[in-house]
């Protein structure tokens, strides 16, 4: 099988592991810089070009697209879909998951547990926005933030109002969420592949920090999931339409709540914490499911 990994950096842990796993299972795996691709979209034979020539036909692609290049990256994925190539995550699903607000609206519609959340840009009653999610302390997030950037914990009503006013001054879209104190600065990352949780780890925030992202100094350890947590992760992935993703869950007094669904989860932390060969599981899923035009939208949506 011929597989392409769409990644801007072939030396990243996740990219290297996926390439190694694919090759060890006997497949041909290329790493292609998404931003250096360009597309022929006007002819009746759609193509993706790279370094002066049309790329060969690939049986499957694995998009490893960073948040900052979502627009162009998903356009490249869509072009591959139009050519009949199987993508482990479809362009529409990636775009859907990258929009935090749309993701939460979809999860809410499916009745999946979430923290109480408000969305605003220029609210005329900041106090009511805060009150509506249960009052301070609250977590305030920039809608476009990633890896814990643009996420602030406001301990008091006054602090929350000041932070929201500051973000309003930037004309930013913001989410205001209840603070799940009982989680103790920890969350659970569930790695879902093909409708199954194949690995899970607990991420604990560093001392004095409430964000558990490993990029922010958090630590990772093995965790045992409850049946409800496992079901929540699987349901969240299904709602987003993602075959492979990381689902971040907090343990609240009301059961598991989903914080985020990540369409391009890093593999280093979870493989190290669990000792599982997640990269090979991803390749094996592709081998079983990659058939020409085996995407729901075929690049149309």
UniProtKB/Swiss-Prot annotation:
Binds 2 magnesium or manganese ions per subunit. One of its GO terms (molecular function) is ATP binding. SUPFAM superfamilies: Glutathione synthetase ATP-binding domain-like. This is Probable alpha-L-glutamate ligase 2. Mn(2+) 2 binds at residues 260, 262. It is an enzyme of class 6 (ligase). ATP binds at residues 141, 178-179, 187, 211-213. Belongs to the RimK family. HAMAP family: RimK. One of its GO terms (biological process) is protein modification process. PROSITE patterns: ATP_GRASP. Its EC number is 6.3.2.-. One of its GO terms (cellular component) is cytoplasm. Mn(2+) 1 binds at residues 248, 260. Transmembrane segments: none annotated. Mg(2+) 2 binds at residues 260, 262. Its cofactor is Mg(2+); Mn(2+). InterPro entries: ATP-grasp, ATP-grasp_RimK-type, ATP_grasp_subdomain_1, RimK, Rimk_N, Rp_bS6_RimK/Lys_biosynth_LsyX. Mg(2+) 1 binds at residues 248, 260. It comes from the Bacteria. It comes from Pseudoalteromonas atlantica (strain T6c / ATCC BAA-1087). It holds the Pfam family RimK. Keywords: ATP-binding, Ligase, Magnesium, Manganese, Metal-binding, Nucleotide-binding, Protein biosynthesis. Residues 104-287 form the ATP-grasp domain.
């Amino acid at each position: 099988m011929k597989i392409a990994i769409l990644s801007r950096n072939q030396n990243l842990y996740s990219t290297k592991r996926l390439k190694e796993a694919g090759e060890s299972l006997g497949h041909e795996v290329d790493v292609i810089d998404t931003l250096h691709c360009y597309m022929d979209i006007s002819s009746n034979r759609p193509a993706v070009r790279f370094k002066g020539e049309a790329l060969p036909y690939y049986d499957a692609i694995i998009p490893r697209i960073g948040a900052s290049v979502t627009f162009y990256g998903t356009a490249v994925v869509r072009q591959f879909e139009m050519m009949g190539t199987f993508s482990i995550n479809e362009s529409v699903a990636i775009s859907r998951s990258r929009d935090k607000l749309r993701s939460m609206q979809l999860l809410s519609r499916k009745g999946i547990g979430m923290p109480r959340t408000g969305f605003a840009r220029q609210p005329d009653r900041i106090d009511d926005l805060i009150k509506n999610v249960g009052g301070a302390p609250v977590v305030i997030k920039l809608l476009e933030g990633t890896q814990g950037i643009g996420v602030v914990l406001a301990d008091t009503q006054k602090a929350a109002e000041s932070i929201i006013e500051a973000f309003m001054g930037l004309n930013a879209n913001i989410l205001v969420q209840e603070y799940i104190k009982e989680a103790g600065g920890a969350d659970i990352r569930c790695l879902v592949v093909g409708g199954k949780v194949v690995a899970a780890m607990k991420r604990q925030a560093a001392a004095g920090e409430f964000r558990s992202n490993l990029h922010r100094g958090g630590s990772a350890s093995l965790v045992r999931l409850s049946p409800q947590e496992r079901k929540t992760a699987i349901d969240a992935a299904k709602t987003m339409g993602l075959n492979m993703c990381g689902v971040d869950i907090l343990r609240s007094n009301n059961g598991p709540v989903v914080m985020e669904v990540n369409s391009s989860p890093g593999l280093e932390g979870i493989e190290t914490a669990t000792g599982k060969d997640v990269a090979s599981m991803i390749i094996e899923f592709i081998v079983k499911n990659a058939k020409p035009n085996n995407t729901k939208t075929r690049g149309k949506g």
